[in-house]
């Protein structure tokens, strides 16, 4: 069994991680932390977990991780970078669901996240946990930088075109939509029911923190810099991401065949039949990314539609997928959930 700990278990990604791990046949949860809820039973705070877990939240200042093989950080940005080194030095593997280790250029990270990085020496070692790209590196990793929700959907949508050199990589466009759970569980005015319901809006158009992460990943697949216009939107739904991606083709290519071949052996990327329009509800509660490809009017513009659940493939599910790879388990162990419909 893999003995696991969770730092920060009261947010949406934390409880999603709990939901997945309590059902995982090869994992035993040893500890879960929360400053505010220390001493409270996990199933008292989250009634959905009644009968599934007997742990209480522990004070992170007093917790002992020595019995853990791996620790997940489901915390705000800036926490994992302060604690990861001590865990790694103790032989404990770390999977960070926040952004602390995603961007290799530390100065760039500090610019976007507005803080000094506490462990720049670990950034180079951290493996970016997108299995469809870095599976072999993930196998041997001690420290995983779990991808962001938008970056997962956007990169999986663009990667086949970028790798094939079939598009103008200087002028990519990602028009993305997310449910309100992507903003986290903290109380904020823009996610109140009266503000978010019956409403639809863009945000962070001048620049979003996920832009450098997406740009970094696609540049690696392109073997050169890429240009990306990234516009996120907040939609009146709880969970889900829909990315509509645009790229100008530079040569004739069979998009359907290209995508089917690229993802033929990927257990969690589903390339839909030609002409399909994926829906966010088709992946709700699952670790799947569903993709459809289009070429309107047989012109020179490729339109790629990519949908994920921001809390699963965009966060907790992908983190467990990475854990499975790190420990030599079948990749789908404990995360091949059928999406919830309706």
From Swiss-Prot:
Compartmental location: Cytoplasm
Record's keyword annotation contains Cytoplasm: yes
Pathway(s) this gene product operates in, as recorded in its UniProt entry: Amino-acid biosynthesis; L-arginine biosynthesis; N(2)-acetyl-L-ornithine from L-glutamate: step 3/4
InterPro entries tied to this protein: AGPR_AS (IPR023013), AGPR_type-1 (IPR000706), NAD(P)-bd_dom_sf (IPR036291), NAGSA_dehydrogenase (IPR050085), Semialdehyde_DH_NAD-bd (IPR000534)
Keyword list, A-Z: Amino-acid biosynthesis, Arginine biosynthesis, Cytoplasm, NADP, Oxidoreductase
Gene Ontology process terms (BP): L-arginine biosynthetic process
PANTHER family reported for this sequence: N-ACETYL-GAMMA-GLUTAMYL-PHOSPHATE REDUCTASE, CHLOROPLASTIC-RELATED, N-ACETYL-GAMMA-GLUTAMYL-PHOSPHATE REDUCTASE, CHLOROPLASTIC-RELATED-RELATED
Protein family according to the UniProt entry: Belongs to the NAGSA dehydrogenase family. Type 1 subfamily.
Biological role: Catalyzes the NADPH-dependent reduction of N-acetyl-5-glutamyl phosphate to yield N-acetyl-L-glutamate 5-semialdehyde.
Name under which the protein is recorded: N-acetyl-gamma-glutamyl-phosphate reductase
Organism expressing this protein natively: Nitrosomonas europaea (strain ATCC 19718 / CIP 103999 / KCTC 2705 / NBRC 14298)
Lineage of producing organism: Bacteria, Pseudomonadati, Pseudomonadota, Betaproteobacteria, Nitrosomonadales
């Amino acid at each position: 069994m893999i003995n696991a700990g969770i730092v920060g278990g009261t947010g949406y990604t934390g409880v999603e991680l709990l939901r997945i791990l309590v059902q995982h046949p090869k994992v035993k949860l040893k500890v879960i932390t929360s400053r505010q809820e220390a001493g409270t039973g996990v199933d008292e705070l989250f009634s959905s977990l009644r009968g599934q877990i007997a742990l209480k939240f522990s004070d992170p200042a007093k917790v002992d991780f020595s019995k853990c093989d791996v620790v997940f950080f489901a915390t705000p940005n800036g926490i994992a970078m302060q604690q990861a080194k001590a865990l790694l030095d103790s032989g404990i593997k770390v999977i960070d669901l926040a952004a602390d280790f995603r961007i290799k250029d530390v100065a760039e990270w500090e610019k976007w996240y507005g803080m000094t990085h506490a462990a720049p020496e670990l950034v180079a070692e951290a493996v970016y946990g997108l299995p469809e790209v870095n599976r072999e590196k993930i196998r041997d990793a001690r420290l995983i930088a779990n991808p962001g929700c938008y970056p997962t959907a956007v990169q999986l949508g663009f990667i086949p075109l970028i790798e094939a050199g079939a598009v103008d990589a200087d002028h990519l466009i990602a028009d993305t939509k997310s449910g309100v759970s992507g903003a986290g569980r903290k109380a904020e005015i823009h996610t109140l029911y009266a503000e978010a319901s019956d409403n639809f809006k863009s945000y962070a158009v001048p620049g979003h923190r996920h832009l450098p992460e997406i740009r970094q990943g696609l540049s690696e697949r392109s073997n050169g810099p890429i240009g990306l216009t990234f516009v996120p939107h907040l939609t009146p739904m709880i969970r889900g991401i829909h990315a509509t991606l645009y790229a100008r083709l530079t040569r004739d290519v069979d998009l359907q065949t290209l995508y089917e071949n690229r993802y033929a052996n990927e257990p969690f990327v589903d390339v839909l039949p030609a002409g399909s329009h994926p829906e966010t509800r088709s992946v709700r509660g699952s670790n799947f990314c569903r993709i459809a490809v289009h070429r309107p009017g047989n012109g020179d513009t490729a339109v790629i539609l990519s949908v994920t659940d921001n809390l699963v493939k965009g966060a907790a599910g992908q983190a467990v997928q990475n854990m499975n790879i790190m420990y030599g388990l079948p990749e789908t162990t404990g995360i091949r959930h059928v999406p919830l419909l309706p």
